[in-house]
Amino acid sequence: MVGRAQIETRSGWFRLQGCGPAVLAVLACLLVASTWHVFGNVWDEPEHIAAGLSLIDQGDYRYDNQHPPLGRLAAALGPQLAGARLPANSSPSGEQAGRDILYHSSASYDTLLTLARAGMLPFLLLLALAQWYWVRENFGAAMAWLSTLFLLSTPAILGHAGVVALDVPVTALCVLGFWLLQRWVVAPTLKRSIALGVAAGLAVSTKISAIPFLALSGIVMLAAQLLLNLGALSNREILREKLRYGGGALLALVLAIVICIAAYGPNLVHVPGIGMRVPLGVQELTLNIRGVEFHNAHGHPAYLLGETDLMGWWYFYLVALAVKTTIPMLLLGIPGLAWLTWRGIRARQLGQMVPGLVFATLLIFCCLYSHINIGVRHVLVLYPLLAIGAGAAALALWQRSLAPTARTLARTGARALAAVLVLWQFATLVTAYPDYLAWFNAFAGAHPERILVDSDLDWGQDLRRLSQELARRQIPEVYLAYRGSADLTREHLPPYKPLAPNQQVTGWIVLDMLSLKESNHGYDWLLNYQPQQRIGKSIDLYYLPPR
C-alpha cells in the first residue's frame, strides 16, 4: 500500500516535471532579455522588421526573397502595436526601410528594437519545451533535464535568441518536427500525420532550410525503421505499411503546404505566367525557394582562417562548431551521440538512434551542399542533438560512479569528470555574459577574428558600446571603418570620417573586425600598431599620434 507521504512525493515530482521545463525556459528568456540593452541592432534586424511590417501593414512581402514570413511577423508585431508603420514611400532597400522604421517612428529606437527582439522569445520557449519532452519520451526525465540544461547554456543558442534572426525560430520548429517525425515513423496514424504536417508547415514558414532539414531527417528515420523491421513483416503487412506511410506522408505534405501559403496572409496577387489571381503565399513561397537556390549557387563572400572565398569551404561548419561550441559539449556530445546510436542499434530502438543519425546526416549535408558560409547560426539545428549526446554521456558517467561493481577509483573519477564538465558548461553562462553571440571557446585563442568573423564575432552589434566609450574618453573626432546596418547619422557618435581601405591616417581610428577581414587586406596596415582597446568583442580603437 502506498502511503500519503509517497503520494505527495510523487505528485510533487510530477508537478516538477510538468512546470519545471517551462520555468527553465522562462529563466533562459529572462537571461537573454537582460542582454538587449547592451547591443544595438545587428545587421539583419532592420530588414526582418521591415519585411514583417510590410506584410502586416500593406499585405505585400517586398523585402529579401529568401525567407518566409513567420519569424518576421513575430518580430514586427510588437513594433506595429507600438505605432511603427512602414513609410508610404518606403525605400526599395529592406535595410533602409528598417532603419527608417527604427529611427523615425513615434516610439523610440530602443523601444522598437526591444519589442522586436521580444518576438523571438516564444521560439526559445518552444525550443526548450520541445527538447525536454522529446528527450523525456525517449530517454527519461533525468536525460531530459540534462540535455535541456546543456542546450540552454550554449552561447550560440542564447546569442542568436537575443536578436531578430530566423535561426533560433527554425531550430525550435525543427526540433518539434524531429520529435513528431519520429513518432510518425513509428506509427503513421492520422493524428500524428496531422501534427507532423502542422509542425513542418510552421518550420518551413520560418526558414527554407527547414525543407532539407526535415526531409533528410525523415528519410533517415524511415530507413532506420524499415531496417529494424526487416524480416519481421509479411508481404501483406509490408504493402499495408507502404499504404499507411504513403497516405500519411501525403496528408502531412498537403497540410504543410497549406500552412506555408497561409503564413503570407489572405491577399491575392495576379501571376502573369498563369493569367489568374492566386494567394500571395503561392507566389512568394516559390520565390523564397528559388531565392535560396540562387544565393547558394552563386555563393556569398565568406571568411575562414585568414582566407576569403565566394563559394566557401566544405569544412567551414566543422571549424565553426569546433570553436563556437563549449568544450564540455564537444567532449561529451560527440561520444554521447555515437554511444546512443550504437546502443540503439543493439537494442533495435529507433528513439535512441535518431539523435546521432540526424546529427550526422545534417552535418554532412551542410558541409557538402552549403555555399553560404556566414556563421555557425546556419547549423544551430545541430545543437539540440549535440545536447542530447552530452546529456547521455554525462548521465552515463554519473551512473557508472554508482555501479556496485565499479572500483572505488573508477567511481570517483567518473563522478568527478561528470561534475567538472557539467559545471564547466554552466559556468559559461557567467563567463560569456553578455557576449553570447560573439563568444568563442578556448580553442580559438586570443584572436578569434583569425578564424571566423561574420555573425560569429562581428554582426555590427557593438556600435552602442563604441559610442559610450568614445563619449567616456571625450574623443573629439574619429576615422571610422564600420560595417553594419545602423544609421550612423542617428547614433551618438562624435564627428567622424569614413576610413577607406589603404587610407593611412593618424589620430583616433575605429576599426571593426568585419572591415578588417573582408576588405582585401585594405586595413592590414593597422595591424602594425597596438589598439588602445577592444570595444566589446568586435571593434578595435586605435590612436596614432601625428607624424
Task: Walk through the language-model features, giving the residues of each.
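C-terminal luminal/periplasmic domains and tails of membrane-associated envelope-modifying transferases
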Residues: 4-7, 441-547
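Signature aromatic-anchored transmembrane alpha helix within multi-pass, membrane-resident enzymes
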Residues: 22-24, 215-219, 253, 341, ...
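Interfacial juxtamembrane loops and adjacent helix segments
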Residues: 61-119, 271-310
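Transmembrane-helix motifs of polytopic, lipid-linked glycan transferases
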Residues: 118-138, 176
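Membrane-interface transmembrane helices that cradle and orient dolichyl/undecaprenyl
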Residues: 177-193
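Membrane-proximal, lumen/periplasm-facing interface regions of secretory-pathway glyco-
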Residues: 286-289, 295-304, 417-468, 484-488
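Hydrophobic, aromatic-rich transmembrane alpha-helices
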Residues: 320, 325-348
